[in-house]
Amino acid sequence: KCMDAINEKLKNLKKLNIIVVGKSGVGKSTLINSLFRDKIAETGLGRPITTEIRKIEKKDYPMAIYDTPGFELSEGQQAKVKEEIIELIHKGLATGDINNAIHCIWYCINVGGNRTFDQTEINWLKELIEKNKVTKVPIIVVLTQACPKTKGKQMQTLVEKENLDIIKVIPVLAQDMDFDGEYVAKAYGLDQLVDIMSEALPEELQDTLQNVQKASLKSKKKRSRAVVAAASAVAFGEGFIPIPFSDAAVLIPTQITMIASITTNFGMNISKSVIMSFISSTIGTAGTTILGKS
């Protein structure tokens, strides 16, 4: 039953849909693969869903990335990308299905090397924000390759001074950066991006986010503690049912649900033997025996 509960939980995860926007070479694939498990950005080029946007997804994976072309395009193409993003948002909302909706937009700006503040990018973003006023899809500005941190912080301050209607500006270094073997700048910012995503997404997508993200163990633990607290509250009430010898059998379904939720949040692929071992340590040998027979 526990394995069935886990499989059912995984099957029922809502699909998280993210639009990722930015110039070519901004590091979108590195960002995606560093934040999410299974290296979704390496599953292929994706399939075109409009003339400018491609959808990257994987079978039995509860997330899709909508990738836009770089901004080294003509002014007309840039305008077309913007219109197609808004059209994609409206089409998803029109279905009334959360699995089809766009839940977040990442606007990626490369601040590495000798990159400087580009007002053209900010102006494009302002136009997108204006068109997004009705749909209000959360927008996060991700400053990629933000090394050194002082450079990322400076760019963050410049973008924040624009007073854009966005969720947050986050400097990120998605992978460790090696400087000729003499110094290694450690990756940072991915855990903060997960936290901001968690704040921006609805409750229906919280389990999905934790399932697919691999950058923040702290966030997974926080979500799992909430699951345990909820299960404990239910078990406390069930434990007082005045039926002789019923407690263990009554509690087990609650604990199965709890274990399934935690396993899903951690994105683990585990066997029945591992599950039974975990159950034995949490609800005891007697509970494992009852569960094994059911």
Regions found by a protein language model. Give the residues of each.
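Conserved protein kinase catalytic core
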Residues: 39, 73-74, 113-116, 150-151, ...
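C-terminal helical "lid" subdomain and adjoining coupling/linker elements of P-loop NTPases
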Residues: 180-181, 199-219, 244-247
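Short loop/turn segments at strand-loop or loop-helix junctions that form parts
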Residues: 66-71, 107-111, 144-145, 170-176
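Cytosolic juxtamembrane amphipathic/interface segments immediately preceding
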Residues: 5-7, 214-223
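Conserved G1/Walker A P-loop phosphate-binding module
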Residues: 1-76, 266-269
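Conserved C-terminal guanine-recognition region of P-loop GTPase G domains, centered on the G4
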Residues: 81-167
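Canonical P-loop GTPase G-domain recognition
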Residues: 1-3, 137-140, 145-207
